[in-house]
Regions:
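Glycine-rich adenosine-cofactor-binding loop
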Residues: 123, 133-145
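Glycine- and Gly-Pro-enriched alpha-helical subdomains that act as flexible
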Residues: 128-131
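N-terminal ligand-binding/catalytic initiation module
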Residues: 1-118, 122-124
Length: 145
């Protein structure tokens, strides 16, 4: 029987991997968009379990598969907006990665920091491609009233 070895990567390790590597994070996100546009990604709809309509406390399950890379994964993210009032993070998550030849899990990764980095990078990549060329920021009015 084949032994399954699963790598556990905690938040400190994620931070160390990506420390001072903003360009790398942007490239990963940009490459993911390109792969999706080229139909190299299976990206089912997000499953959202909302526990309380008033608070919007929920857990989201977001699966995806990179076909050419032969890896499938799922991000499990809890969103509890009122946590901010308790001085605890309102978003936390974990990711599970499996290879798709045998389906064996390969890694469990703390997804909280990954979620933050991805969210920021999506905005930056969108700005790169959607901003008008040769534009400058509008200066503030000379006088505020």
């Amino acid at each position: 029987m084949k032994e399954v070895s699963i790598k556990i990567i905690n938040q400190n390790e994620v931070a160390a991997i990506f420390k001072n590597r903003t360009d790398y994070v942007l490239k990963i996100v940009e490459d993911a968009f390109i792969k999706w546009a080229n139909n190299e990604v299976l990206l089912p709809d997000k499953i959202s379990q909302i526990f309380d309509q008033q608070t919007q406390n929920r857990i989201n399950c977001m699966p995806a598969t990179l076909l050419k890379d032969k890896v499938s994964g799922m991000k499990w993210v809890s969103v509890f907006p009122a946590n901010a009032l308790k001085s605890v993070p309102n978003v936390s998550g974990v990711m599970l990665l499996s290879e798709i030849k045998t389906g064996f899990p390969q890694a469990v990764i703390d997804g909280t920091l990954c979620t933050r980095m991805r969210t920021a990078a999506v905005g930056a990549v969108a700005a790169k491609y959607l901003a008008r060329h040769h534009t400058r920021p509008t200066p503030p009015p000379a006088k505020f009233e």
